[in-house]
Amino acid sequence: MKRRIALVAALIGSIIGAMAGPVAAGELRIGGTGAVTDVLRALAPDFTARTGIALVVIPSLGSSGANNAVADGKLGLAVSGRDLRDKEKARGLQVVGLLRTPYGLVTSRPGPDSLARADVVGLYKSARPLWPDGMPMLIVLRPADDSDNDVLAALFPGMAEALTQLRKRRDLSVAATDQDNADMAERMNGSLVGATLAQIKAEKRNLRFVALDGVMPSLDAYLDGSYAHGKLLYLVAPATPGAEAKAFVDFLAGPAARSRLRDLGLVAGAR
């Protein structure tokens, strides 16, 4: 699995290297965390129809790769799964907007399934976790530096320690990307992985969310506070954003995109 992660890192490097030249006028190159790749593709036609700007979605970059590409002038905008690090701010990067989406646990089981939130960390710590009906629960991990680990730790007190212990085991799968994570979850009977509502909806995944304490992580539940846990997605621009990047940020924050974003399990909010 370490070899798989190294190959993904090399692929990201080759993609960034292939993006020759500065961002062209009349188009916006954008990329970022894998969970939003299909979200951006779904938004592109309406954005282009309204602005005349072509939205060119560069896949498979990840948050760090996309942020670096913005700093290098190869992307006009990034959508990052985490806030900026100090070294990225030192390169002139800035957060110019936010998207929010519910985050929860998904499974390949036909469902509906429900877990007590207080029991989840114990399942992650168990050597042989089981679903309530006795079916083996197959947990998939993310790389240690992935932003989803922080979201899980915030969702379940004690999860950070549980994930640290799980990484010592050699029998668990590690998903290098958001797409790998969903692919593995679909293939495994009894899977349990963390994911955003936006990714599951945009990619039309054959996965179902698990209710926590009886509450499903829907967008309505997230917005009314009955389901409190989500993931922030950061719109990252250079110190002087181009007109195309500004147009896309304005598009996301305005009424034209509101309905489509909701269909995809997202809401926009200015920082």
Predicted regions located by residue number:
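Exported/periplasmic ABC-transporter solute-binding proteins
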Residues: 26-64, 68-75, 80-99, 103-271
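Bacterial N-terminal signal peptides
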Residues: 6-18
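Positively charged n-region of N-terminal signal peptides that target proteins for export
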Residues: 1-4
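Sec/Tat signal peptide C-region and signal peptidase I cleavage site
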Residues: 19-25
